[in-house]
Amino acid sequence: MKRLIILFSLIFGLTATACSNGSTTGQPLVVGETPIAPESRLIDARPDWAAIPGEMAPDFSYTLADGTHKLSDLRGKLVIVNFWASWCLPCVEEMPTLDAARRTNPDLVILAVNRNESTEAISAFAPKVGVSFPLITDRDGAIGERYGVVNLPTTFFINRDGTIAVRHVGALTAERLAERLAEVR
């Protein structure tokens, strides 16, 4: 009987561990100069509509060390929402280009939304790229799904009025990024 209880406890513990999604809902953190948002939430959840140029960008919230923010709070600014993953080589290669654009354009806000990776994976990745814009966890993929993201990287350029100006699929070179930014200014 004692062995049966131990066996049951072991099976239960392993099952609970295997079913865990690996995410932690810890406090927002900063790795180097990179703010990391361990929690995000889709606000605009209309399932029948994918994000397309000319329409309002689907709203979402994210929590950083200085509080919870929403995409819609950034109206009046030029915003780039970039969907990426740490295993995606083109995503990694374009990060310095995005960071350089943010540093040279004070009114540009970049939100890098990670598709389906844990906060721990993002925290381990952050020092490798050393960007100054937030890396946002989209652990369940709801934000990316709402934006209709299939391939990575996918980048949305959002006008100051909150509408999507451009959807770009694939890595951005410095030249292509400058062209896209010129389209939305």
Map each language-model feature to its residues.
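N-terminal targeting signals for export/organelle localization
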Residues: 1-58
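Conserved redox-active cysteine motifs that mediate thiol-disulfide chemistry
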Residues: 75, 83-100
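Active-site acidic short loop of glycosyltransferases
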Residues: 75-77, 107, 131-132, 149
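Thiol/disulfide oxidoreductase modules built on the thioredoxin-like
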Residues: 124-132, 138-184
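Structural microenvironment flanking redox-active thiols in thiol-disulfide oxidoreductases
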Residues: 92-129, 139-146
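Hydrophobic beta-strand anchors of alpha/beta hydrolase catalytic cores
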Residues: 80-81, 110
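Short gly/ser/thr-rich secondary-structure transition/capping motifs
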Residues: 42-43, 61-66, 136-138
